[in-house]
Amino acid sequence: ASAPRFKQFITEVTLGDVELAGFLQRSCGLALSADVTEHALWMHFGAGSNGKSTLLTILSELLGSYAGPAPVDMLLVKGRSKEAENQFASIAGKRLVTNVETDEGVRLSEATTKLLTGGDTVQARARYGQPWPLAPTWKLNIACNHKPLVRGTDSGIWRRIKLIPWLAKFEEGTANLSLMDELRAELPGI
Protein backbone atom coordinates (compact mmCIF):
# COMPACT_ATOMS: atom_id res chain seq x y z
CA ALA A 1 0.00 0.00 0.00
CA SER A 2 1.14 3.52 -0.66
CA ALA A 3 0.57 6.74 1.27
CA PRO A 4 0.91 9.73 -1.07
CA ARG A 5 -1.20 12.01 1.15
CA PHE A 6 0.95 11.15 4.16
CA LYS A 7 4.11 11.98 2.18
CA GLN A 8 2.51 15.25 1.09
CA PHE A 9 1.60 15.96 4.72
CA ILE A 10 5.24 15.46 5.78
CA THR A 11 6.37 17.83 3.02
CA GLU A 12 3.80 20.42 4.09
CA VAL A 13 4.61 20.34 7.80
CA THR A 14 8.36 20.53 7.16
CA LEU A 15 7.91 23.38 4.66
CA GLY A 16 9.71 21.30 2.05
CA ASP A 17 12.87 20.84 4.15
CA VAL A 18 14.07 17.50 2.76
CA GLU A 19 16.52 16.84 5.60
CA LEU A 20 13.90 17.54 8.28
CA ALA A 21 11.31 15.45 6.42
CA GLY A 22 13.72 12.52 6.29
CA PHE A 23 14.53 12.87 9.98
CA LEU A 24 10.82 13.01 10.85
CA GLN A 25 10.06 9.92 8.74
CA ARG A 26 12.93 7.99 10.36
CA SER A 27 11.59 8.87 13.81
CA CYS A 28 8.18 7.57 12.71
CA GLY A 29 9.74 4.33 11.47
CA LEU A 30 11.63 3.84 14.72
CA ALA A 31 8.35 4.13 16.63
CA LEU A 32 7.15 0.95 14.92
CA SER A 33 9.86 -1.20 16.46
CA ALA A 34 10.81 -2.19 19.98
CA ASP A 35 14.42 -1.20 19.26
CA VAL A 36 15.56 1.39 21.82
CA THR A 37 19.21 1.72 20.82
CA GLU A 38 18.55 5.30 19.68
CA HIS A 39 18.31 6.46 23.36
CA ALA A 40 16.19 9.44 22.37
CA LEU A 41 13.40 11.74 23.42
CA TRP A 42 11.74 13.32 20.41
CA MET A 43 10.63 16.84 21.30
CA HIS A 44 8.21 18.26 18.71
CA PHE A 45 7.89 21.98 19.36
CA GLY A 46 6.24 24.96 17.72
CA ALA A 47 3.16 27.17 17.88
CA GLY A 48 -0.18 25.40 17.48
CA SER A 49 -1.97 24.47 14.25
CA ASN A 50 1.15 23.05 12.64
CA GLY A 51 0.51 19.29 12.40
CA LYS A 52 2.51 17.89 15.31
CA SER A 53 -0.52 16.51 17.16
CA THR A 54 -1.94 15.24 13.87
CA LEU A 55 1.21 13.22 13.23
CA LEU A 56 1.33 11.72 16.72
CA THR A 57 -2.40 10.93 16.59
CA ILE A 58 -2.16 9.14 13.25
CA LEU A 59 0.91 7.18 14.40
CA SER A 60 -0.94 6.23 17.59
CA GLU A 61 -3.90 5.00 15.55
CA LEU A 62 -1.55 3.04 13.30
CA LEU A 63 0.10 1.35 16.28
CA GLY A 64 -3.12 0.69 18.22
CA SER A 65 -2.36 -0.88 21.61
CA TYR A 66 1.37 -0.42 21.00
CA ALA A 67 0.88 3.34 21.46
CA GLY A 68 -0.38 5.35 24.36
CA PRO A 69 -0.12 8.60 26.25
CA ALA A 70 2.28 9.16 29.10
CA PRO A 71 1.03 10.82 32.25
CA VAL A 72 1.44 14.54 31.59
CA ASP A 73 3.96 15.11 34.38
CA MET A 74 5.96 11.89 33.99
CA LEU A 75 8.98 13.65 32.46
CA LEU A 76 8.75 16.86 34.46
CA VAL A 77 10.49 17.95 37.64
CA LYS A 78 8.22 17.42 40.60
CA GLY A 79 8.46 16.09 44.13
CA ARG A 80 10.13 12.67 44.11
CA SER A 81 7.58 10.00 44.94
CA LYS A 82 6.75 6.37 44.46
CA GLU A 83 4.18 7.55 41.91
CA ALA A 84 6.95 7.45 39.28
CA GLU A 85 6.98 3.64 39.33
CA ASN A 86 3.20 3.66 38.80
CA GLN A 87 3.64 5.99 35.84
CA PHE A 88 6.27 3.70 34.34
CA ALA A 89 3.79 0.82 34.56
CA SER A 90 1.43 2.77 32.29
CA ILE A 91 3.90 2.61 29.37
CA ALA A 92 4.69 -1.12 29.63
CA GLY A 93 4.69 -2.76 26.22
CA LYS A 94 4.26 0.49 24.29
CA ARG A 95 6.33 1.40 21.24
CA LEU A 96 5.15 5.00 20.91
CA VAL A 97 4.56 7.01 24.07
CA THR A 98 3.23 10.52 23.61
CA ASN A 99 3.03 13.45 25.96
CA VAL A 100 1.39 16.65 24.79
CA GLU A 101 1.21 20.28 25.74
CA THR A 102 3.53 20.96 28.62
CA ASP A 103 2.93 24.30 30.30
CA GLU A 104 5.29 27.15 29.58
CA GLY A 105 8.19 27.34 32.02
CA VAL A 106 8.05 23.74 33.30
CA ARG A 107 11.32 21.90 33.74
CA LEU A 108 12.19 18.56 32.19
CA SER A 109 13.39 15.97 34.70
CA GLU A 110 16.77 15.11 33.30
CA ALA A 111 17.16 12.10 35.60
CA THR A 112 13.82 10.59 34.53
CA THR A 113 14.50 11.38 30.87
CA LYS A 114 17.88 9.65 31.04
CA LEU A 115 16.35 6.71 32.91
CA LEU A 116 13.56 6.20 30.36
CA THR A 117 15.73 6.73 27.27
CA GLY A 118 18.87 4.92 28.39
CA GLY A 119 17.82 1.46 27.27
CA ASP A 120 18.14 -0.04 30.75
CA THR A 121 15.44 -1.95 32.58
CA VAL A 122 13.45 0.22 34.99
CA GLN A 123 11.34 -0.70 37.98
CA ALA A 124 7.59 -0.42 37.47
CA ARG A 125 4.70 -1.10 39.76
CA ALA A 126 0.95 -1.09 39.28
CA ARG A 127 -0.87 0.82 41.98
CA TYR A 128 -0.89 -1.31 45.15
CA GLY A 129 0.97 -4.06 43.27
CA GLN A 130 4.43 -5.54 43.54
CA PRO A 131 7.30 -3.93 41.62
CA TRP A 132 8.65 -5.68 38.54
CA PRO A 133 11.53 -5.08 36.11
CA LEU A 134 10.33 -3.37 32.94
CA ALA A 135 12.45 -3.62 29.80
CA PRO A 136 12.04 -0.56 27.57
CA THR A 137 10.30 -0.83 24.20
CA TRP A 138 9.05 2.75 23.97
CA LYS A 139 10.00 5.87 22.04
CA LEU A 140 9.11 9.02 23.98
CA ASN A 141 7.57 11.89 22.01
CA ILE A 142 6.61 15.24 23.51
CA ALA A 143 4.50 17.65 21.46
CA CYS A 144 4.59 21.13 22.92
CA ASN A 145 4.09 24.76 22.05
CA HIS A 146 6.78 25.67 24.59
CA LYS A 147 9.89 23.55 25.07
CA PRO A 148 10.35 22.38 28.67
CA LEU A 149 13.37 23.91 30.37
CA VAL A 150 16.53 21.82 30.47
CA ARG A 151 19.18 23.02 32.90
CA GLY A 152 21.81 20.40 32.23
CA THR A 153 24.66 21.15 29.88
CA ASP A 154 26.19 17.67 29.76
CA SER A 155 26.07 15.53 26.65
CA GLY A 156 24.17 12.86 28.60
CA ILE A 157 20.94 14.82 28.29
CA TRP A 158 21.49 16.76 25.06
CA ARG A 159 22.47 13.75 22.97
CA ARG A 160 19.11 12.21 23.92
CA ILE A 161 16.89 15.19 23.11
CA LYS A 162 16.01 15.31 19.42
CA LEU A 163 14.49 18.72 18.75
CA ILE A 164 12.00 18.73 15.90
CA PRO A 165 10.85 22.24 14.93
CA TRP A 166 7.32 22.61 13.56
CA LEU A 167 7.32 25.94 11.76
CA ALA A 168 4.34 25.52 9.42
CA LYS A 169 1.10 27.27 10.31
CA PHE A 170 -2.31 26.06 9.10
CA GLU A 171 -4.82 28.72 10.04
CA GLU A 172 -8.51 29.06 9.31
CA GLY A 173 -9.00 29.04 5.59
CA THR A 174 -5.80 27.07 4.90
CA ALA A 175 -6.38 24.15 7.27
CA ASN A 176 -7.57 20.91 5.65
CA LEU A 177 -10.52 19.88 7.81
CA SER A 178 -10.64 16.40 6.24
CA LEU A 179 -6.90 15.70 6.71
CA MET A 180 -7.34 13.12 9.48
CA ASP A 181 -9.80 11.14 7.36
CA GLU A 182 -7.42 11.31 4.39
CA LEU A 183 -4.53 10.06 6.51
CA ARG A 184 -6.63 7.33 8.14
CA ALA A 185 -7.51 6.05 4.67
CA GLU A 186 -3.77 5.53 4.09
CA LEU A 187 -2.95 3.80 7.40
CA PRO A 188 -1.95 0.50 5.71
CA GLY A 189 0.63 2.40 3.62
CA ILE A 190 1.99 4.56 6.40
Role assignments for model-derived ranges:
Residues 1-93, 162-165:
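P-loop NTPase catalytic core of nucleic-acid-dependent motor ATPases
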Residues 55-58, 108-116, 156-160, 178, ...:
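Alpha-helical scaffold elements adjacent to nucleotide-binding pockets in ATP/GTP-utilizing enzyme cores
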Residues 70-84, 111-131, 174-182:
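Substrate-gripping "pore-loop 1 plus following alpha2 helix"
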Residues 84-93, 124-143:
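AAA+/SF3 P-loop NTPase mechanochemical coupling elements
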Residues 100, 141, 161:
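Hydrophobic, well-ordered secondary-structure elements that form the walls
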Residues 103-104, 145-150, 167-171:
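Conserved nucleotide-binding/hydrolysis micro-motifs of P-loop NTPases
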Residues 134-137, 153-190:
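Phosphate-sensing "switch" segment of ASCE/P-loop ATPases
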